[in-house]
């Protein structure tokens, strides 16, 4: 009888790393199918989509339903002369730093990353850490980066929380870590 792993430790690591080319090729495949969907439905899905002022100085990076809530707040604030926006993450893994940098306004001075998870004991949540690595590797060390959590357990995140976040980003030194919608 054969039991356990089908490969020994001497080759497992090598096989695991050999998968990298498949993951690295995936974004191009996803983009191809997004283009087909966009053509049929009239949408504009990409790996990352930006919404807001083209010269925004305060930008949120998030994924999921919070993006629709943020859109409404962005429309309101930009109509009043503010310069805010959001980067919507459409493909999270594999992470494509170049695609994020392509849509992030060059004028962004402060970026708040919203994660819908809590990673106890970590320096930050997954999306925050990916954005942080992207900015640092691109040499964008002057961009103030903050990270927060929202919506755990389906906790509602109303527009007032997004208003409060953009207000916080106006400060010279906004909170580095935060939560939206609860008192913590």
Language model segments and positions:
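Conformationally flexible catalytic loops at phosphate/diphosphate-handling active centers
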Residues: 1-50
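An N-terminal assembly and electron-transfer interface module characteristic of large anaerobic redox
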Residues: 8-16, 91-99, 121-122
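A general structural motif
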Residues: 29-45, 62-69, 90-97
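Solvent-exposed alpha-helices and their adjacent loops that cap or buttress functional pockets
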Residues: 51-54, 103-105, 138-139, 172
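Redox- and metal-dependent alpha/beta enzyme cores, enriched for Fe-S-associated oxidoreductases
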Residues: 55-82, 95-102
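Residue-level recognition of beta-strand->loop/alpha-helix junctions
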Residues: 88-90, 149
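Peripheral docking tails and interdomain loops at the edges
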Residues: 110, 114-184
């Amino acid at each position: 009888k054969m039991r356990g792993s089908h490969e020994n430790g001497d080759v497992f690591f090598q096989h695991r790393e050999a998968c990298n080319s498949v993951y690295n090729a995936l974004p191009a495949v996803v983009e191809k199918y997004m283009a087909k969907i966009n053509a049929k439905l009239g949408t504009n899905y990409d790996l990352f989509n930006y919404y807001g002022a083209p010269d925004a100085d305060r930008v949120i990076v998030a994924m999921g339903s919070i993006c629709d809530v943020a859109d409404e707040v962005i429309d309101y604030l930009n109509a009043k002369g503010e310069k805010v926006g959001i980067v919507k993450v459409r493909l999270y893994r594999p992470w494509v730093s170049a695609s994020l940098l392509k849509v992030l306004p060059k004028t962004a001075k402060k970026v708040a990353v919203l994660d819908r998870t809590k990673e106890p004991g970590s320096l930050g949540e997954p999306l925050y850490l990916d954005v942080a690595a992207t900015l640092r590797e691109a040499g964008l060390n002057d961009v103030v980066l903050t990270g927060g959590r929202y919506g755990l357990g389906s906790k509602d995140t109303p527009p007032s929380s997004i208003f409060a976040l953009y207000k916080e980003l106006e400060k010279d030194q906004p909170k580095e870590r935060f939560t939206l919608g609860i008192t913590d």
